[in-house]
Amino acid sequence: MISAKSVKELRERTGAGMMDCKKALTETDGDIEKAVEVLREKGLAAAAKKSGRVAAEGLVKTYISEDKKSGAIVELNCETDFVAANEDFIAFADALAKIATSTSATTVEELVNEKFDAEATIQEALTGLIARLGENMTVRRFVKFSVDNGVVKSYIHGGGRIGVLVEVACDVESPAVEEVAKELCMQIAAANPLFLSKEEVDQDSIEKEKEIYRVQALNEGKPEKIVEKMVMGRIQKYYKEVCLLEQLWVKDSDKTITKFIDEKAKEAGSAIKVNRFVRFERGEGIEKVEENFAEEVAKQLGK
């Protein structure tokens, strides 16, 4: 019988989870020292101790199926750019993107419970990687696309700093469709649109923008009778900044993205439709902890 006291002591010594500690003690007939070794071998002690540390570095990776009908984008985080450049970390991120493309999982929690290989789940394999490389790591997010008629395309910029996944539909197979998908990936990486079209912009966002522009115009001393006209002009400019189909093409500022797509649709002999896109930027939204080097050294020396 494994006592609660033994489980508590093992948790305090290793930082591993309660169920992992209980399992290790059961395997070792209650021998705490042997249980510590079991947890270390499994990487659970090291992984648990590191799990509280901020992981804001890492890689964004993508994978596209051979038939170009499906693909996935993932973000795998670690603590430093040094580990992000490690071959094992890169290989894990690549494998993760490939698994995400064919999985039925819809959440990260479901994804990490998928099989990584014949021996382990993704979470178990990640735990082992954490133990080997000595940093906290997390599978932060993933998105997968698939299309029956059309292509899924991806683009990685800056060695895994930014990743884009695009789904384009067309009833015919044509080099023009792939060209559209490729150029859209580059556009999204560079211009960072927030929406696909004007119709996707929620009304609350528009009303907030209108109010901001209205106050700005009044503060500039503009007559009230022309303020509304100015506001609508600025809203149109806002659409061109945040909506992919309204943006000017980065390769030719005389064309909007919509015009570029229409031209390619004529080449293909069929309508080309952008179904959806996603853009990941490594670490976006994660608050990094800024360490004071002198304080860190003093802490290490016990001062």
Swiss-Prot record:
Signal peptide: none annotated. Gene3D superfamilies: 1.10.286.20, DNA helicase RuvA subunit, C-terminal domain (1.10.8.10), Elongation factor Ts, dimerisation domain (3.30.479.20). Residues 80-83 are annotated as: Involved in Mg(2+) ion dislocation from EF-Tu. Its main location: cytoplasm. One of its GO terms (molecular function) is translation elongation factor activity. The keyword Cytoplasm applies. Keywords: Cytoplasm, Elongation factor, Protein biosynthesis. Disulfide bonds: none annotated. InterPro entries: EF-Ts_dimer_sf, Transl_elong_EFTs/EF1B, Transl_elong_EFTs/EF1B_dimer, Transl_elong_Ts_CS, UBA-like_sf. GO terms for cellular component: cytoplasm. It is found in: Cytoplasm. HAMAP family: EF_Ts (MF_00050). Associates with the EF-Tu.GDP complex and induces the exchange of GDP to GTP. It remains bound to the aminoacyl-tRNA.EF-Tu.GTP complex up to the GTP hydrolysis stage on the ribosome. PANTHER family: ELONGATION FACTOR TS, ELONGATION FACTOR TS, MITOCHONDRIAL. Belongs to the EF-Ts family. This is Elongation factor Ts.
